[in-house]
């Protein structure tokens, strides 16, 4: 049952991160907000570990958990939030986010030995095409089309997506066993190792403590860091990483719907058409594929 509903819940929880980021940017600096979020998330997961008497991993696995957290959370969200705060348009950032499943699919055969079949490759390409259609109006908007002033933030945004792709594959290869609660706790320690020095070096640690800022922080900790990330780790462990990553394609259309409800942003025809293409791509990528007997023998030998 959980295997069926987990992707749906994950898409909803993960997509709210974009709305939360919009609220949080008004009330806090990016690294400061993320550092507080990671610290509270680590404490929340630690409390669950103690309450449930979870078995902690050995030193080698603990190090791998901390290391993976540096990429899954620290470099990824730190780079993404900083890039958006420093001039990368949301539409372009959406395209970059949509690149993650393609990066994952290309790297998975090399790093974790997964093989994608033709239909799954088609699904990944359709997902990217759907995202491009959905946000095409923003690409041709003069207010968002000029990226000459945002070369460095754009590069940081690209590096952030490569970071979460690497972190996802590393998680799949090296953290397939053990209790997920201690692993998640240690991953947020890894995120703090990245974020705290950035906060101390580049920010004044501004957080205004308003009701909106606190609400965004609470949701970031319990809805995103615990709910969304917990489900992501579960999906990575239960299925192929490229299939789990393909769910990222559903984020921009879902965020657009949430932005329409929360901020009154219009739902355009390209967005609706793009969403249809995206959903088709995700379906093809996640559809079970029958492996021919000859291919199955080759996989067993590998």
Model feature map: region roles:
Residues 1-35, 43, 144-173, 193, ...:
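Glycine-/small-residue-enriched transmembrane alpha-helix faces in small-molecule transporters
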Residues 1-3, 27-31, 35, 57-63, ...:
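Juxtamembrane helix-entry segments on the extracytoplasmic side of multipass membrane proteins
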Residues 7, 60-69, 116-129, 178-187:
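Cytoplasmic-side transmembrane-helix entry/capping segments in multi-pass membrane proteins
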Residues 13, 17-18, 46-97, 133, ...:
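Specific transmembrane alpha-helical segments of multi-pass solute transporters/efflux pumps
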Residues 26-75, 101-107, 162-167, 184-203, ...:
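Transmembrane alpha-helices of multi-pass small-molecule transport proteins
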Residues 34-36, 77, 92-99, 169-192, ...:
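Helix-helix packing/entry segments at the starts of transmembrane helices
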Residues 45, 119-139, 195, 249-250, ...:
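Hydrophobic transmembrane alpha-helices of multi-pass small-molecule transport proteins
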Residues 47-56, 100-125, 253-273:
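C-terminal transmembrane-helix exit sites in multi-pass transporters
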């Amino acid at each position: 049952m959980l295997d069926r509903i987990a992707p749906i819940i994950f898409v909803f929880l993960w997509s709210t991160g974009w709305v939360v980021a919009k609220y949080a940017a008004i009330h806090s600096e990016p690294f400061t907000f993320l550092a507080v979020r990671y610290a509270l998330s680590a404490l929340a997961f630690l409390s669950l570990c103690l309450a449930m008497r979870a078995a902690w991993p050995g030193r080698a696995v603990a190090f791998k958990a901390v290391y993976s957290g540096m990429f899954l959370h620290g470099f990824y969200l730190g780079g993404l939030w900083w890039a958006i705060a420093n001039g990368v348009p949301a539409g372009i950032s959406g395209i970059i986010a949509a690149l993650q499943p393609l990066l994952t699919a290309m790297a998975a055969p090399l790093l974790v030995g997964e093989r994608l079949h033709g239909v799954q490759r088609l699904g990944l390409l359709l997902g990217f095409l759907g995202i491009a259609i959905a946000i095409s109006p923003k690409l041709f908007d003069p207010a968002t089309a000029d990226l000459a002033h945002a070369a460095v933030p754009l590069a940081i945004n690209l590096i952030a997506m490569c970071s979460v792709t690497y972190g996802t594959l590393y998680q799949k290869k090296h953290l397939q066993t053990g209790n997920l609660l201690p692993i998640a706790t240690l991953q947020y320690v890894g995120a703090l190792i990245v974020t705290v020095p950035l906060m101390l070096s580049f920010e004044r640690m501004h957080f205004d403590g308003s009701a909106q800022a606190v609400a965004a922080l609470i949701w970031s900790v319990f809805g995103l860091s615990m709910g969304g990330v917990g489900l992501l780790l579960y999906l990575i462990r239960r299925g192929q990483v490229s299939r789990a990553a393909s769910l990222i394609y559903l984020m921009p259309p879902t965020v657009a719907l949430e932005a329409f409800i929360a901020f009154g942003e219009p739902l355009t025809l390209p967005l609706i058409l793009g969403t249809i293409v995206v959903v088709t791509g995700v379906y093809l990528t996640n559809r079970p594929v029958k492996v021919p007997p000859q291919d199955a023998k080759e996989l067993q030998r590998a």
